[in-house]
C-alpha cells in the first residue's frame, strides 16, 4: 500500500455573518498563507435592540490572522454587503478592496461620510478580470441580475477546486441591464 502525500494546503470556507440571517454578509476563504474576504456587510437591528444602529460580525479571527488577509471582494453595493467595511478596516488592514464600479463609488462615499482617514485602495473590476492572489487563489467574476445594477458573482479557483458564490441574484426574464451569466456561473 502506497501513501501519497499532498503538498496542497487545505482550504477553509467560513461565514462571519449572513447565514441564517438577513444581512451581515461576510465570507472568508482561507488557506495556510492567505485569507480573502467576500463582502463585508452589516445587519440592521430588530426592534429588540433599541439604540443599536448596526450589527457587525465578530472580527476576532481576522484580527488574530491579519497578516494573512490579502483582499476584500465585493459582489454588489447593498448595505448588507458593503456596510461593514468601515468597521472592518478599523479592526484589520485590508490591502485592497475589489468592487464593481457602482459599489466602489458607494464604498468611497461611505468612507468619506464616516471620515475614515485610513488610505484604502479600491480597485474596480469587470466580468472579464482575473485576479491572482499568491499561489493559492485566482478570482474571476460573472454578471448576475439583482435589484441593484452592477451585481456580480465570484468564482475562486483554488488548489482544491472551484468555489462559487453568487452574491444576491434573481433570474430575471426581462432584465433592465445585462443578463445573468449562467454559463460562467456553472
Feature locations, PLM:
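His/Asp/Glu-rich metal-coordinating catalytic cores
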Residues: 2-73, 78-186
Amino acid at each position: 500500500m502506497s501513501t501519497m502525500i499532498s503538498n496542497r494546503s487545505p482550504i477553509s470556507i467560513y461565514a462571519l455573518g449572513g447565514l441564517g440571517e438577513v444581512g451581515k454578509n461576510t465570507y472568508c476563504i482561507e488557506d495556510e498563507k492567505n485569507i480573502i474576504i467576500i463582502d463585508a456587510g452589516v445587519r440592521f437591528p430588530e426592534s429588540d435592540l433599541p439604540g443599536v444602529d448596526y450589527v457587525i460580525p465578530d472580527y476576532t479571527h481576522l484580527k488574530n490572522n491579519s497578516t494573512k488577509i490579502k483582499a476584500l471582494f465585493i459582489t454588489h453595493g447593498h448595505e448588507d454587503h458593503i456596510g461593514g467595511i468601515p468597521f472592518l478596516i478599523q479592526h484589520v488592514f485590508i490591502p485592497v478592496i475589489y468592487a464593481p464600479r457602482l459599489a466602489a463609488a458607494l464604498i468611497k462615499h461611505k468612507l468619506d461620510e464616516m471620515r475614515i482617514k485610513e488610505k484604502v485602495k479600491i480597485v474596480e473590476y469587470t466580468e472579464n478580470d482575473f485576479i491572482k492572489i499568491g499561489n493559492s487563489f485566482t478570482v474571476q467574476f460573472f454578471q448576475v441580475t439583482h435589484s441593484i445594477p452592477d451585481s456580480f458573482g465570484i468564482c475562486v479557483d483554488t488548489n482544491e477546486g472551484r468555489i462559487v458564490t453568487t452574491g444576491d441574484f434573481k433570474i430575471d426574464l426581462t432584465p433592465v441591464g445585462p443578463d445573468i451569466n449562467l454559463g460562467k456561473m456553472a
